[in-house]
Amino acid sequence: MDLVNHLPDRLLFAVPKKGRLYEKCCSLLKGVDIQFRRSNRLDIAISTNLPIALIFLPAADIPIFVGEGNCDLGITGLDQIKEADMFNSVEDLLDLQFGSCKLQIQVPAEGEITKPEQLVGKKIVSSFTKLSVDYFKTLENVEDETKLSTSIRYVGGSVEASCALGVADAIVDLVESGETMKAAGLTAIETILQTSAHLISSKKPKFPELVERIHQRFEGLMAAQKYVLCNYNAPRSILSAVLQITPGRRSATISALEKKSDENEEWVAVSSMVEKKKISDIMDDLKKAGASDILVFDIGNCRV
């Protein structure tokens, strides 16, 4: 079925059909209010509230579908985008900051190899052959892949078993916690790429306004997850000091408070977005500076 022509009135949004990115993708789609129901047997889901069709694809295929203009939007790993050699063919809209891992060179922990230069001329296996070839071309200072002295072969699964089975001297694979590699008797000697899930779009989308709308929703959702709203009261005399602590994303919101009859000093109310991971220290610093009535609120969603 030609989905581009079969669904001409809908933006096609490619998302991973399974694997390490799938569950989080579904959660983010809910967060940006793309409502849908997916049948277990179908890899297409029609949004019930937006002119969008979700296309569930292998993560490795998504950069190609988006880069060639078959889909307007996609979510996949940066590693998959670069492995497909499509980074310059798509718009990299946003790092979604999940699915973080490292593409690493791993060697037997009890072996003699401790640095990548020792692998020149040896056997490497990986499911990321392009990125591996690019790395070793740079290492060997050659431009033509055929002139590589290092052998790089493709293995689709259980890459970590390759060294123990005698297939390879080293592997190049994605590593999240490192526990699987450690259990296989491997250790990292080089990180080729730091990767995470990215929101990408076609360079010539069929629905540019809707692409930008969804992009803004994802940006707002990411900001809501990163920031909290900090409200507090402070004497006007210390305003410059407390604003150094809570400058806000662009600037803080300041409102004058009604002066009580028994007060000699004017007070202001301050509202500012601050990074969630820093909030405890920020509250301590505000209290020390002389602020009071310090309150913190979660941000459900926003537009930035």
From Swiss-Prot:
Chief localisation class: cytoplasm
The reaction(s) this protein catalyses: 1-(5-phospho-beta-D-ribosyl)-ATP + diphosphate = 5-phospho-alpha-D-ribose 1-diphosphate + ATP
Single Gene Ontology BP annotation: L-histidine biosynthetic process
Transmembrane segment boundaries: none
Keyword Cell membrane assigned: no
EC numbers: 2.4.2.17
SUPFAM superfamilies assigned: GlnB-like, Periplasmic binding protein-like II
Functional pathway: Amino-acid biosynthesis; L-histidine biosynthesis; L-histidine from 5-phospho-alpha-D-ribose 1-diphosphate: step 1/9
GO molecular function ontology, one term from the record: magnesium ion binding
One Pfam family hit: HisG_C
Gene3D superfamilies: 3.30.70.120, Periplasmic binding protein-like II
CC terms in the record's Gene Ontology section: cytoplasm
Domain of life: Eukaryota
Keywords recorded for this protein, A-Z: Amino-acid biosynthesis, ATP-binding, Cytoplasm, Glycosyltransferase, Histidine biosynthesis, Nucleotide-binding, Transferase
Annotated localization: Cytoplasm
Enzyme's top EC category: transferase
Family to which this protein belongs: Belongs to the ATP phosphoribosyltransferase family.
Function of the molecule: Catalyzes the condensation of ATP and 5-phosphoribose 1-diphosphate to form N'-(5'-phosphoribosyl)-ATP (PR-ATP). Has a crucial role in the pathway because the rate of histidine biosynthesis seems to be controlled primarily by regulation of the enzymatic activity.
Protein's name in the database: ATP phosphoribosyltransferase
Gene that specifies this protein: HIS1
